[in-house]
Regions:
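Terminal amphipathic alpha-helical/low-complexity segments used for targeting or macromolecular assembly
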Residues: 1-64, 106-109, 131, 171-180
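Conserved short histidine dyad/triad with adjacent acidic residue
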Residues: 51, 73-74
Length: 180
């Protein structure tokens, strides 16, 4: 059991080191800053996550660093990346359905074999353009742009950019219709 715990500890240290480098922190104080930043983000996310009031959820997400436009609506349990919220940009008139998820990073957290070059960390901005609708249960992965007035169908996994005025469906999501 100690070998497994050692692997978890090594992976945790590696994740912490990557986060410190990304934010420009170093040393013991940098490690402290990262932990405080994460705890703050987690608390604000938990408040937003289960809020039935969209305006409150949006204010909490903005406090975390998510860029959110005007007239947006977030349903309860919409999840926005915990580690890199500042890389998520949501433009005006966007709707996020319940249990939809937006990730600005992908990273195997506990498996050192995957982490050491076989499955590299990907950290990239996610942009949801004006008028887009992200339906319940949809997942938006890192580096994706969802086009203007596009609709992501329920349960879809978006791994590539979505053009403007389209409906996408499936895993992975593909365009099934243009909206005129």
């Amino acid at each position: 059991m100690s070998k497994y715990n050692d692997l978890i500890d090594d992976a945790t240290k590696l994740n912490e080191k990557e986060l410190m480098e990304y934010h420009g922190y170093s040393g013991t104080f940098g490690r402290f800053q990262i932990r405080i930043k994460y705890i703050n983000s987690w608390i604000l996310h938990r408040l937003a996550f289960s809020s039935a009031h969209s305006g409150f959820a949006i204010r909490m997400q903005k406090a975390r660093g998510v860029k959110i436009g005007k007239n947006c609506h977030f349903n309860p349990y919409a999840f926005i990346d915990l580690i890199y919220p500042e890389l998520v940009q949501i433009e005006d008139n966007v709707t996020l359905g319940s249990f939809s998820m937006i990730f600005a990073h992908s990273n195997p957290t506990a498996n050192l074999f995957l982490k050491k070059g076989n499955y590299p960390r990907k950290v990239a901005e996610v942009i949801i353009k004006s008028g887009a609708v992200i339906n319940p249960g949809s997942i938006i992965t890192s580096g994706v742009t969802v086009g203007k007035n596009s609709i992501v169908s329920p349960g879809s996994v978006v791994t590539q950019d979505v053009p403007d005025h389209c409906v996408v469906v499936g895993n992975p999501a593909r365009v099934v219709r243009k909206i005129e």
